[in-house]
């Protein structure tokens, strides 16, 4: 007898810097000092927020992103590497 189990664990987060353009994601965590949390939240970059990469600048330049709440932003790659996200298609 062969049993099949569907794996339902949440996918592992990846960083915003790794994403292709056009995919909506949800922020799971941001690796920055706690003192920066209010600034990041004002930009729409806090856990639970959704965003998408619109385009990437050439030669490692900034990512142009759209957030659901704060509009469009240009993020430097260092910050984008510190924003951990999961697939946003399952988000409400």
Model-based region annotation:
Residues 1-92:
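Compact, glycine-rich, soluble single-domain proteins
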